[in-house]
């Protein structure tokens, strides 16, 4: 039986409770992502970046010049954005496919009770939700190392590292403690805006200013709606208040510890959202002043793009 047939034969609707043994799949996904990225970088993104940034004529130049093009900051950062765009788009589509038809996608009360007589923590997970969790956990495990050894160093390196570590801890904690209903919606909220950001950055690197400006505006709007409105006023409201009103605290003596751990991490993410929004707002003001032209990346790079290139 081939890989496709094996995947097709899995009952993705099958329900079971999460176990520590499930986390054994996490290292496999953590290795999967750098492998896929390396292959895409080598055979797809590098050629695409050279084509859209320098044009077809660059393929006729000498090997020395072509090597310099391939190692240029614009090409390197275009490949980074292309990879992130592929991941965030696939992760968003996966999260929506897993959560969209579930009752808790549109009603946060179902994070904790229902359907039927299910009450947290006695809420089994579908196989597809387990896959989503291992997919995301593997990516953020890889991202911690990629931020140090692979990515372009940016001025918000520390903030990004804090975000990746917090997100990974939240994913693992919510999986083990059966808080995956809330976690799955949070994953769906957080990946959408990053798709627009990476499209905008790629457009900027290849000189498509209009598309870059439009993408950045869509990124800013989605950031406000999803991360600064829906996340705090629906998700955090549910994890902070709604859970207290629906879950019997006397049956869960360790509940207060988990409650404060989970919410502390979630509110820390909100602080990061606000920090990044300040940077986004400055970019919006700059974009208006420049009559719609996007002047630079939302997060400034530690190295300049203005170095000489033939």
From Swiss-Prot:
<feature type="transmembrane region" description="Helical">
    <location>
        <begin position="16"/>
        <end position="36"/>
    </location>
</feature>
<keyword id="KW-0444">Lipid biosynthesis</keyword>
<keyword id="KW-0443">Lipid metabolism</keyword>
<dbReference type="GO" id="GO:0005794">
    <property type="term" value="C:Golgi apparatus"/>
</dbReference>
<dbReference type="GO" id="GO:0006665">
    <property type="term" value="P:sphingolipid metabolic process"/>
</dbReference>
<feature type="transmembrane region" description="Helical">
    <location>
        <begin position="216"/>
        <end position="236"/>
    </location>
</feature>
<keyword id="KW-0812">Transmembrane</keyword>
<dbReference type="GO" id="GO:0010256">
    <property type="term" value="P:endomembrane system organization"/>
</dbReference>
<feature type="transmembrane region" description="Helical">
    <location>
        <begin position="131"/>
        <end position="151"/>
    </location>
</feature>
<feature type="modified residue" description="Phosphoserine">
    <location>
        <position position="302"/>
    </location>
</feature>
<dbReference type="GO" id="GO:0050291">
    <property type="term" value="F:sphingosine N-acyltransferase activity"/>
</dbReference>
<dbReference type="GO" id="GO:0005789">
    <property type="term" value="C:endoplasmic reticulum membrane"/>
</dbReference>
<dbReference type="GO" id="GO:0005783">
    <property type="term" value="C:endoplasmic reticulum"/>
</dbReference>
<dbReference type="GO" id="GO:0046513">
    <property type="term" value="P:ceramide biosynthetic process"/>
</dbReference>
<dbReference type="GO" id="GO:2000012">
    <property type="term" value="P:regulation of auxin polar transport"/>
</dbReference>
<keyword id="KW-0256">Endoplasmic reticulum</keyword>
<keyword id="KW-0472">Membrane</keyword>
<feature type="transmembrane region" description="Helical">
    <location>
        <begin position="260"/>
        <end position="280"/>
    </location>
</feature>
<feature type="modified residue" description="Phosphoserine">
    <location>
        <position position="300"/>
    </location>
</feature>
<keyword id="KW-0597">Phosphoprotein</keyword>
<keyword id="KW-1133">Transmembrane helix</keyword>
<dbReference type="Pfam" id="PF03798">
    <property type="entry name" value="TRAM_LAG1_CLN8"/>
</dbReference>
<comment type="function">
    <text>Essential for plant growth, promotes cell division in root meristems. Catalyzes the biosynthesis of ceramide sphingolipids with C(16) to C(28) fatty acids, structural membrane lipids involved in membrane trafficking (e.g. early endosomes) and cell polarity (e.g. polar auxin transport related proteins); mostly active with t18:0 and saturated very long saturated fatty acids (C24:0 and C26:0), such as long-chain base (LCB) phytosphingosine (t18:0), lignoceroyl- and hexacosanoyl-CoAs. Mediates resistance to sphinganine-analog mycotoxins (SAMs, e.g.</text>
</comment>
<dbReference type="InterPro" id="IPR016439">
    <property type="entry name" value="Lag1/Lac1-like"/>
</dbReference>
<protein>
    <recommendedName>
        <fullName>Ceramide synthase LOH1</fullName>
        <ecNumber>2.3.1.-</ecNumber>
    </recommendedName>
</protein>
<dbReference type="GO" id="GO:0042761">
    <property type="term" value="P:very long-chain fatty acid biosynthetic process"/>
</dbReference>
<dbReference type="InterPro" id="IPR006634">
    <property type="entry name" value="TLC-dom"/>
</dbReference>
<feature type="domain" description="TLC">
    <location>
        <begin position="76"/>
        <end position="289"/>
    </location>
</feature>
<feature type="transmembrane region" description="Helical">
    <location>
        <begin position="157"/>
        <end position="177"/>
    </location>
</feature>
<feature type="transmembrane region" description="Helical">
    <location>
        <begin position="85"/>
        <end position="105"/>
    </location>
</feature>
<dbReference type="GO" id="GO:0005886">
    <property type="term" value="C:plasma membrane"/>
</dbReference>
<keyword id="KW-0808">Transferase</keyword>
<comment type="pathway">
    <text>Sphingolipid metabolism.</text>
</comment>
């Amino acid at each position: 039986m081939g890989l496709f047939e094996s995947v097709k034969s899995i009952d993705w609707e099958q329900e079971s409770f999460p176990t520590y043994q499930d986390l054994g799949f996490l290292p496999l996904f953590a290795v999967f992502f750098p492998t896929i990225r390396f292959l895409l970088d080598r055979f797809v993104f590098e050629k695409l970046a050279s084509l859209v940034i320098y044009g077809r004529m660059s393929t006729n130049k000498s090997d020395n010049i072509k090597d310099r093009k391939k190692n240029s900051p614009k090409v390197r950062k275009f490949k980074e954005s292309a990879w992130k765009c592929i991941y965030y788009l696939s992760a968003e589509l996966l999260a929506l496919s897993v959560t969209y038809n579930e009752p808790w996608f549109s009603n946060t009360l179902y994070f904790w009770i229902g359907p039927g007589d299910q009450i947290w923590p006695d809420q089994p997970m579908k196989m597809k939700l387990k896959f989503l969790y291992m997919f995301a956990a593997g990516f953020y495990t890889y991202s911690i190392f990629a931020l140090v050894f692979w990515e372009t160093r940016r001025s918000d390196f520390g903030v990004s590292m804090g975000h990746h570590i917090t997100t990974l801890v939240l994913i693992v904690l919510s999986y083990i403690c059966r808080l995956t209903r809330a976690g799955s919606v949070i994953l769906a909220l957080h990946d959408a805006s990053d798709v627009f950001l990476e499209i905008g950055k790629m457009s900027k690197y290849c000189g498509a200013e209009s598309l870059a400006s439009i993408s950045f505006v869509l990124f800013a709007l989605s950031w406000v709606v999803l991360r600064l409105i829906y996340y705090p006023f629906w998700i955090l409201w549910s994890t902070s208040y709604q859970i207290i009103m629906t879950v019997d605290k006397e049956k869960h003596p360790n509940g207060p510890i988990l409650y404060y751990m989970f919410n502390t991490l979630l509110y820390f993410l909100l602080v990061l959202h606000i920090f990044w929004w300040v940077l986004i707002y400055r970019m919006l003001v700059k974009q208006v002043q420049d009559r719609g032209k996007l002047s630079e990346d939302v997060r400034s790079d530690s190295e300049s793009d203005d170095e000489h290139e033939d």
